[in-house]
Amino acid sequence: MDGSELVEPTTKCPLKHGVRFHTSFGGRSNRDWWPNQLNLKILHQHAPASNPMPAGFSYAEQVETLDVEALKRDLAALMTDSQDWWPADYGHYGPLFVRMAWHSAGTYRTGDGRGGAGGGQQRFAPLNSWPDNGNLDKARRLIWPIKQKYGARISWADLMILAADVGMETMGFKTFGFGFGREDTWEPEEDVHWGAEDTWLGDARYTGERELDKPLGAVQMGLIYVNPEGPNGKPDPLAAAHDIRETFARMAMNDEETVALIAGGHTFGKAHGAGDAAHVGVEPEAAGIALQGLGWKNSFGSGVGSDAITSGLEGPWTPNPIKWDNGFFDTLFGHEWELTKSPAGAFQWTPKDPEAGPKAPDAHDPSRQVAPMMLTTDLALRLDPNYGPISKRFHENPDQFQDAFARAWFKLTHRDMGPKARYLGPLVPQEELLWQDPLPEPQGPPIDANDIRELKAKVLATGLSVPQLVATAWASASTFRGSDKRGGANGARIRLSPQKDWAVNQPAQLANVLATLEGVQSAFNGGQTDGKTVSLADLIVLAGCAAVEQAAKAAGHDVEVPFTPGRVDASQNQTDVASFGVLEPKADGFRNYLNTDLPLTAEELLVDKAQLLTLSAPEMTVLVGGLRALNANTDQSSHGVFTTRPGSLTNDFFVNLLDMRTVWTATSEDEAQFEGRDRTTGDLKWTATRVDLIFGSNSQLRALAEVFAQSDSQGAFVGAFVAAWTKVMNLDRFDLA
């Protein structure tokens, strides 16, 4: 018996000591039995039951009551309040907090917008136990007294970033600004794909000529960015530059921002590798209960201070590791470097002539002097043909370096927060930045209920069909990602590059629909005398709502789809084409669209899309069924349109999917497409994709489909569809929150 086998209870006391029962504390899960089972749990993360805050809690309201200056004073005092259980290097915790914040924010990747500092996920597994996050558990314990003091007025997620900002300010650096607004989560996020490897530092994520799997950003399991010793521990600076460029690009950083971030971060502090890594104990999630969530217990010497072991690399980068200056570039260019190994056996670089330049004090014994060191990834900033000139320019122009690092650091720590409108507090910089996806201010009074009725009638009189209007509104709104709060209908960027040319948006049809709606917009705006206007962003959504109402009426249901005006139209100058390119759907099961080589099934990609849209399983289900009934597939594909009355908002998709008179067979070896034939006659009735059939195959989704297929559920189906539709249309309306 391995301790996980089932033990049947007897008539005696069921709480047998030393015996593991099939409870929440043990036993096989469904995923253990069926590893390929569709994971719908990611649609129900962060449920209210997991949140300890009271009903109605508003973090934004709490931030308004926060004495920010008092908080910053307390953080500044903490920087030099060294604790015996984890002494501060050089008597200052600033560098440690910079690393904590960097590793909190640095998990962000552009491919799916997941990761980043929002939510404070560094507190939970797996991030709290990644090898690259070694000893950051101590950093979080050091700021706990401040979190305890200020309570709900500041989240862990905000505090971990602000601690680094204040730390840098106390070391002489002027930051660009800070936005509060990162709300804490209370459980690990299960939607983030960190990689398929089952060992720490595994790198099975590469194919071909070192092509990194999408959407991953880090080069190895358990690293934030790249291996500082070089690819797979090979100390090759030019090969390291390749990894750096790819990884930082997937964090939305260009070459200049990359150089600034690495050099700026390594201006502070030191690396820790005083002895053999064999002295280091297990990570926090594997540590014994008496350690109270702390990991990496070190048996080398005192285990702390001069005896600390974290990365295995050892030493400072600059002569003054707790002062903002140009010391990193002075050191990088001021020496010729030779390969060596740290006391822990890690590859790093040391000056060929250690007496040629200034040394740094020992981090815990000011009477001792130590030579600086560089990592393989640091030398890449000098030797790479693109990074090298940037580094040289920063070395010769410290003001440019300071500004570049301030801006890149602000971007790093705010990239997953969405538009500037979501930033809170008095430290938000005034400057508008292109990567924030800026929007213009609304002009004139908003349209009212009479205007809305008039515009609906005019749209429906244009001759545009229900599928055309629904598909356009969905295409506009469904770019939203709850991960990094980007995309959505506000801005009407569907009319701009690159969205207007995406294959999933049917460019030819889209151009016709937009031209027609622009005609309605122009006529309405031209007829106003009070400065009132309707934006195209609003009109696209309103047109979709009108189409849904018409489709519901055709099915016998009079409904009013909620609509709130207030969207604005962004310009092409406010839209970074490359930045928005990552939002292009390679798969959208709601439109039965699939054009990707990702190693995932169509149904897995549907669930992933639904999670990014913050949808629950019932919301995902009703939207797929409704959009099929509305005939809103890309390129008017008939797959999944299980109805003889397309364009009417019926529950026919569910009724016909669950009809046992239909037999389904695959029409391709990869089982991507299917045909449904009459069980008796063999006549072809329907065609479908995996996305369609999963609602009859997966037991949980079938249970939901059965609800919507019931004879008494037609009205409830329409109501549920309208509610889910409205939610998607308003996902980026942060002004309505």
Curated annotation (Swiss-Prot):
Formation of the three residue Trp-Tyr-Met cross-link is important for the catalase, but not the peroxidase activity of the enzyme. Heme b binds at H266. Its EC number is 1.11.1.21. There is a cross-link at W102-Y225 (Tryptophyl-tyrosyl-methioninium (Trp-Tyr) (with M-251)). There is a cross-link at Y225-M251 (Tryptophyl-tyrosyl-methioninium (Tyr-Met) (with W-102)). The active site is at H103 (proton acceptor). InterPro entries: Catalase_peroxidase, Haem_peroxidase, Haem_peroxidase_sf, Peroxidases_AS, Peroxidases_heam-ligand_BS. Its cofactor is heme b. GO terms for molecular function: catalase activity; heme binding; metal ion binding. Bifunctional enzyme with both catalase and broad-spectrum peroxidase activity. Homodimer or homotetramer. HAMAP family: Catal_peroxid. This is Catalase-peroxidase. The gene is katG.
